[in-house]
């Protein structure tokens, strides 16, 4: 049995190292340095292990299907060597990392997957480790035997259509994460369609306003009985984050962690940066950095959670979202400041109901916002777009925004 790992990022290297440690013949390459390698070793290999960034239309993927070679991802590979009993898998368009980080904090399970440590790296270190994995649609598409005993599907909205051939494929790739669950397993689902229709034999628990698990004020109820009182957290503002806490708490409770311990652990939780991160009050103006917002759905959650009047900074590379949907929040938004590659495309969708300024870059946008801001306003940086037109990643974008705030505002 021989493998070809394609992609030399952290997950690709982790997969390659795991295979070598297990004594398998394996090659590793990528499009930048080893473009022809896969053709040179094609007749020797049985299985192709693709990194999450390799899309279905990549020539290697197409050739593998044509040649009837097995195509899997790093998560599936790691699972085949995993000997532990507890895998929690969390997916959704938004909120995955925060929820996994909460579960890790409540349970001490090793966190990883799409964010942080690759599953293969965890398995190589300890193949019996209890794990909480963030699972993306890219990883879901290349799963086969993977089976989490606890699954979570937080939400679903249009995203990644530059990678998936259709919205249906994006949804099916996420649902595939749970296809091997049995009646012994648990699947926690958003009560809204299409998430609630996810096929699985697992015991299903729905969350949301009309679900089994719901947030009322800041309290969590399960089947109309109080489960946990006051789950509010200063770094996790908004209803969407209360549900992230509620779901993570329920997962931890289902794994045997007491409600008292969950509450105690919540008090010491430190939120991940750039996810609706409150930077502070500057000369009477609140500033929030939500650079992780790469979809309109994430922007909507941020707008829902932010006190008016809002000065919104957004823009970057549009991912096919419907920006006209923010009309529902037009009474909260004082003005919108757009920058980035698709600023004019976004402007065309919202200028008939909002005051819009179009700027050259993020710093220009922030300076224009500073001109317009008054005491009591909230500056919300929630781009709702990919970052790669001007930044290396959403993290880099978030770091730049924080530096610009330090440069132009006095605390």
Curated annotation (Swiss-Prot):
Under catalytic activity, the entry for this protein gives:
UDP-N-acetyl-alpha-D-muramoyl-L-alanine + D-glutamate + ATP = UDP-N-acetyl-alpha-D-muramoyl-L-alanyl-D-glutamate + ADP + phosphate + H(+)
Task: Give the record's GO biological process terms.
Answer: cell division; cell wall organization; peptidoglycan biosynthetic process; regulation of cell shape
Which GO terms label this protein's molecular function in UniProt? ATP binding; UDP-N-acetylmuramoylalanine-D-glutamate ligase activity
What Gene3D superfamilies does the entry give?
Answer: Mur ligase, C-terminal domain, Mur-like, catalytic domain
Enzyme Commission code(s) on record: 6.3.2.9
Identify the NCBIfam families for this entry: murD
Species classification: Bacteria, Pseudomonadati, Aquificota, Aquificia, Aquificales
**PANTHER family for this protein:** UDP-N-ACETYLMURAMOYLALANINE--D-GLUTAMATE LIGASE (PTHR43692:SF1)
Member of which family?
Belongs to the MurCDEF family.
Which keywords does UniProt give here? ATP-binding, Cell cycle, Cell division, Cell shape, Cell wall biogenesis/degradation, Cytoplasm, Ligase, Nucleotide-binding, Peptidoglycan synthesis
Its annotated function is as follows: Cell wall formation. Catalyzes the addition of glutamate to the nucleotide precursor UDP-N-acetylmuramoyl-L-alanine (UMA).
State the name under which the record lists this protein. Answer: UDP-N-acetylmuramoylalanine--D-glutamate ligase
Disulfide cross-links: none
Subcellular localization is given as: Cytoplasm
An example Gene Ontology CC term for this record: cytoplasm
Q: Which domain of life is it from?
A: Bacteria
Under which pathway is this protein filed? Cell wall biogenesis; peptidoglycan biosynthesis
Q: Give the residues the record marks as binding ATP.
A: 92-98
Tell me the InterPro entries matching this sequence. Mur-like_cat_sf, Mur_ligase_C, Mur_ligase_C_dom_sf, Mur_ligase_cen, MurD
Principal location: cytoplasm
